[in-house]
């Protein structure tokens, strides 16, 4: 099971950041997809915390928002796909068979480190491998025909959850990625909330994921990508 690195190891990992940032920045500068971005500040956590995971899910090492640092960011990335050759359940089934079909594998790849079978299932664990210090261990905590949800584990830069869903829509499919997370520690909070570097890396990763999901569907993206961010200041309870 993954463990949280010691603080000294986290700072040593920072020495590898330039390589990771260079790779992501090159792609980021040449994006042509239309982005609709909105960020607002919410006064309370009501409606902005992740769903509870089922009782049967092992909660060992799961990082809850109360375990994090700084504000909670509730983000939703969404796009509409026209002319999809796959229904919403079919598209999600295809994705669950291999998450790397949609991952921007130039700089991010899902590696399953625990679990069996030909497709994603509850209890499976992955590490999202990225250049620099961005590797993130996660566990599947929810799974149905049109969605799945991941919770961050000890050692991840964030404390929270992220859900991927495909929704049937008139004439196509709407694909959404919704996350509820705080920074995992003070260093992560500095990079995400204050310097905003990690925040832009994250945005580039998930918008690239949506582009590749669209290609996987055989359809075309219409209206670009909408990114809605709600910043919630808390309180969130005591750290574990």
Please report, for each region that a protein language model flagged, where it lies by residue.
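Hydrophobic ligand-binding cavity/cleft-lining segments
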Residues: 2-129, 236-239
């Amino acid at each position: 099971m993954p463990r949280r690195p010691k603080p000294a190891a986290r700072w040593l990992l920072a020495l590898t950041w330039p390589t990771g940032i260079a790779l992501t920045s090159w792609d980021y500068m040449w994006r042509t997809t239309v982005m609709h971005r909105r960020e607002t500040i919410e006064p309370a956590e009501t409606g902005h915390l992740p769903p509870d995971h089922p009782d049967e899910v092992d909660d060992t090492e799961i990082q809850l928002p109360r375990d994090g640092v700084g504000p909670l960011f509730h983000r939703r990335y969404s796009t509409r796909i026209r002319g999809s050759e796959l229904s919403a359940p079919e598209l999600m089934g295809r994705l669950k068979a291999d998450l790397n079909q949609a991952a921007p594998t130039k700089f991010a790849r899902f590696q399953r480190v625990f679990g069996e079978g030909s497709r994603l299932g509850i209890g499976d664990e992955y590490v999202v491998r990225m250049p620099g210090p961005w590797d993130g261990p996660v566990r599947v905590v929810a799974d149905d025909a049109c969605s799945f949800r991941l919770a961050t584990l000890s050692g991840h830069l964030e404390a929270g959850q992220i859900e991927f869903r495909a929704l049937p829509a008139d004439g196509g499919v709407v694909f959404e990625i919704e996350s509820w997370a705080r920074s995992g520690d003070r260093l992560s909070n500095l990079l995400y909330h204050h310097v905003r570097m990690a925040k832009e890396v994250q945005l580039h990763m998930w918008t690239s994921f949506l582009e590749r999901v669209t290609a996987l569907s055989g359809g075309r993206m219409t209206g670009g990508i909408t990114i809605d961010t709600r910043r919630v200041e808390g309180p969130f309870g005591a750290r574990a």
